[in-house]
Amino acid sequence: MFASPVTSTPFSVKDILNLEQHQSGLSPMDITSRLENSSCMLSTFKQESYPGTPCLSELTEEMSQRDTAKGPSSFPGSFFVKNYLEMDSKDPKDHKKDICPLQKTLEHDKREAEDPERPRQRKRRKPRVLFSQAQVYELERRFKQQKYLSAPERDHLANVLKLTSTQVKIWFQNRRYKCKRQRQDQTLEMVGLPPPRRIAVPVLVRDGKPCLGESSPYNSPYNVSINPYSYNTYPAYSNYSNPACSGSYNCSYSSMPSMQPTSAGNNFMNFSVGDLNTVQTPIQQASSVSALHHGIRAW
C-alpha cells in the first residue's frame, strides 16, 4: 500500500513549532523592514532627556563595542539607533503645526475666563459715507424726476457721480422714507386735532388728611341749600278768639246748645254745625276764599 500524503493542520503542535522555527530563520533584512514599518507610530513621540541618563551617542558606542566583542551579528548597529535618530531629527516647528484647532479655542476661552473685566473689542463699523454738495444736488434732482431707479439707471448714475451702486440705492431708500414721513406730518397738521381737554380734579386728601371738611376754594355749581319747609306762610287758626274755634273737636246739632271752650290753647277744636255762619264771618274779614282752602288743608 502507498503511504498517504501528510496533511498539515494549522493547529497541531508540529505546525506551531515549525512556525517558531520559521520566524527564527528569517533574514535580518526582513525583520528590519517590518520594524521600520512599525516605527512610524513611535516616531510621533519625542524622546525627552532626563538628568543622570546617558546620552544617545554613549548608548550607540556601548552597543557597537558589544557587537565587536561578541563577534559579527546578524543585525547592524545602525539598526538600533535609526529610530532614535529619526525621532530626534523631527523639527519642533512641524510639531507645533499639528496642534488641534480645538486646543486653540480652549486657550482663547481660558484667557477670557481669566480676564472677565477686560472689555471685548467691538467690531469697527464702516465709516459713514459723506456726499458732496454736487452729489446731493444731482441725487435730489434725479429723485424729483424719478423716485424709483432700475438697476441700469442706478449703475449709470453711480458712474456719473463716482459712487457705488449700493450707495445710490441706499440713498434713494432713505429719501423715500423721509418723503413718506413728511406726508404723514402734513396730514396730521391738516386734520387739526383739538388739544386734549383739561379737567379740574378736586383734591380729596392732602398731606394724609382729608380735605372734605375744609372750605373748598371753588364754588360748586351744585351747591343747593335745602331748608326745612316752613308753615308760616299761612295764618294759624289757633289764634282766633271765637268760641267756635277752640281746641277740642265736638260735633253738635243746632238744637243743642254749643259747649263753651275749655281753654284757648288746646290742640283740639270745638266745631258746631249751627255756628258755621259765625266761623265764616272772621274768615271773610281776614282774607279771601283761597286763604280758607289753604287753612282747611293745613288743618
From Swiss-Prot:
Entry similarity comment: Belongs to the NK-2 homeobox family.
Segment forming the signal sequence: none
A single GO BP: cell differentiation
A Pfam match: Homeodomain
Function: Transcription factor required for the development of the heart and the spleen. Implicated in commitment to and/or differentiation of the myocardial lineage. May regulate the expression of genes involved in cardiogenesis and play a role in the formation of gut and the pharyngeal region. Binds to the core DNA motif of promoter.
Record localization: Nucleus
Record-given protein name: Homeobox protein Nkx-2.5
Keyword Glycosyltransferase in annotation: no
A GO cellular component annotation in the UniProt record: nucleus
SMART domains linked: HOX (SM00389)
Tissue expression from the record: Heart and gut tissue.
UniProt domain comment: The homeobox domain binds to double-stranded DNA.
Record keywords: Developmental protein, DNA-binding, Homeobox, Nucleus
Subunit note: Homodimer (via the homeobox); binds DNA as homodimer.
